[in-house]
């Protein structure tokens, strides 16, 4: 039935669905995992790197995380070439606002501006939607630290913790379980991000070259966006593995004690 309605983006099916937009969302479901966590003292993005090759130039170190302006960064899941077009557009919107009003663009306004463009591509014939979902982290004077997510339909929302890409449903349920509202520090958020990626990524063992992590904090009245170095990511993974081993030992000891009873 759907074949008659999915060749053009602008045609609704009898059930009121836009199949092309749904297919674009499907493309994101096969992309590398990206997650964002909001903490009291900052906000972070963690992403899975699929394109790891020892001959790749380290100059282009960041594959999934893009800096947009002094106060915002984003992470992408989906078709990378589409993502490049959208991140360039985001940077332009931010620069135009800065030029016009002499102050940085509020986070939500930047997200809304891009979502308007994404939405337009679901409405005009002869175009296809962008096959990209984005996670945005940022700080502005109105609402402090913020985390947003947008999808190919032009929909967006503010989140405390969320995930896009492969195995996102499992990751979101883990975040829901372990996210402590009002108590999250950046340190505990980093540990949680590594824990979630370790469980949801399709690899037998988590390694530093497969993960990209960026943090956004405030220091001396300025926003600082940092992409963690490989050594730092290695330390986080090592710490997580030690904690896992410790928890496993304690569990076995407890089971043994119960048996002895």
UniProtKB/Swiss-Prot annotation:
On this chain, the residues bearing N6-acetyllysine are 127, 176
Q: Which SMART domains match?
A: Proteasome_A_N
**Domain of life assignment:** Eukaryota
Q: Name one GO cellular component term.
A: proteasome core complex
- This chain is encoded by the gene named Psma4
- Tissue specificity comment: Ubiquitous.
The record's annotation in PANTHER family points to: PROTEASOME SUBUNIT ALPHA/BETA (PTHR11599)
The family line of this record is: Belongs to the peptidase T1A family.
Q: Which organism is it from?
A: Rattus norvegicus
**Name of this protein:** Proteasome subunit alpha type-4
Region spans: Disordered: 240-261
Example GO biological process: proteasome-mediated ubiquitin-dependent protein catabolic process
Purpose: Component of the 20S core proteasome complex involved in the proteolytic degradation of most intracellular proteins. This complex plays numerous essential roles within the cell by associating with different regulatory particles. Associated with two 19S regulatory particles, forms the 26S proteasome and thus participates in the ATP-dependent degradation of ubiquitinated proteins.
CDD domains noted in UniProt: proteasome_alpha_type_4
Where is coiled-coil annotated?
A: none
Q: Does the keyword section mention Transmembrane helix?
A: no
């Amino acid at each position: 039935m759907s074949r008659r309605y999915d060749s053009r983006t602008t045609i609704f099916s009898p059930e009121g669905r836009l199949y092309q937009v749904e297919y674009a969302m499907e493309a994101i479901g096969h992309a590398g995992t990206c997650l964002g966590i909001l903490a009291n003292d900052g906000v972070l993005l963690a992403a899975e790197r699929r394109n790891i090759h020892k001959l790749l130039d380290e100059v282009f170190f960041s594959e999934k995380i893009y800096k947009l302006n002094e106060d915002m960064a984003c992470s992408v899941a989906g078709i990378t070439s589409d993502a490049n077009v959208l991140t360039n557009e985001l940077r332009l919107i931010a620069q135009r606002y800065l030029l016009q009003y002499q102050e940085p663009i509020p986070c939500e306004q930047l997200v809304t501006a891009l979502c308007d463009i994404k939405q337009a591509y679901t409405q005009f014939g002869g175009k296809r939607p962008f096959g990209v979902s984005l996670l945005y982290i940022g700080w502005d004077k109105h609402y402090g630290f913020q985390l947003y997510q947008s999808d190919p339909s032009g929909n967006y929302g503010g989140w405390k913790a969320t995930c896009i890409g492969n195995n996102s449903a499992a990751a979101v349920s883990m975040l829901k379980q372990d996210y402590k509202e009002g108590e999250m520090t950046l340190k505990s958020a980093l540990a949680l991000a590594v824990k979630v990626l370790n469980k949801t990524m399709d690899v037998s063992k988590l390694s530093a070259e497969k993960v990209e992590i960026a943090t956004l904090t405030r220091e001396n009245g300025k926003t600082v966006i940092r992409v963690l170095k490989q050594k730092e990511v290695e330390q986080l993974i090592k710490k997580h593995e030690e904690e896992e081993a410790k928890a496993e030992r304690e569990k076995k000891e407890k089971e043994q004690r119960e048996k002895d009873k």
